[in-house]
Amino acid sequence: MALPEFSMRQLLEAGVHFGHQTQRWNPRMGPFIYGARNGIHIMDLTQTVPMLDQALQAIRDTVAKGGSILFVGTKRQAQQPIADAAEKCAQYYMNHRWLGGTLTNWQTVSQSINRLKAIDEQSERGFEGLTKKERLGMERDQGKLQASLGGIREMGGRPDLIFVIDVKKEALAVAEANKLGIPVVAVVDTNCAPDGIDYIIPGNDDASRAISLYCDLAARAALDGMSAQLGAAGVDLGAMEEAPVEEAVAAEAPAEEAQA
């Protein structure tokens, strides 16, 4: 595998260049704005392209060194793409609501994760020994904990990098990462400040197509990092029983060509 490729045309078709209304802009994003059209700021994609590439390289390198990525996006249109991307590359995500202290107070959060795991174990046994009322209470707690913590239940500790959609909405996540020195890759729209973002991706953080594109590219970069990590360890990713689908297919293709 290689770092995922993308074109300016793809970015244009996904609407990455569309910012917010000009009166809602943040002057700190001025250097990344090309101009305005019909009262809407237009992003300078000649800057977005190399900056997105640098961000993907950071994701790839983090995973290649054995690090973990936390995908963060809790706005409605980001929730599914964030979860899909993280699951695709065996990383972690938070897409329901950012819980204060997720990074800075991991010990407390891990206690909640342990409670979720304990309830899951009881659920597998049919909540035996509990009354109907107690079972309903457990199921309610299970649903809430799964929504909030399901994406990080196997993370085991703080991530090595976070990938964020909408830095204004996820300001708390960015602040916690900054406090701990965890690098931040983030899509930054024209109404946001790029402060505290290590790898800025100037772009539309509202359009579903744009969000899906960012998430897909980030997942593919992480998969490339995983491939590099396993390759360095002498592991044939395609031969692994639990290998991600993309790698398994890529590994089988040369064999099929050889038989042809």
Curated annotation (Swiss-Prot):
Disulfide bonds: none
Underlying gene: rpsB
InterPro entries linked: Ribosomal_uS2, Ribosomal_uS2_bac/mit/plastid, Ribosomal_uS2_CS, Ribosomal_uS2_flav_dom_sf
Provenance organism: Roseobacter denitrificans (strain ATCC 33942 / OCh 114)
GO biological process: translation
Keywords annotated in UniProt: Ribonucleoprotein, Ribosomal protein
Pfam families, alphabetized: Ribosomal_S2
Official protein name in the record: Small ribosomal subunit protein uS2
GO CC field: cytosolic small ribosomal subunit
Any one GO MF annotation of this record: structural constituent of ribosome
Family in the record: Belongs to the universal ribosomal protein uS2 family.
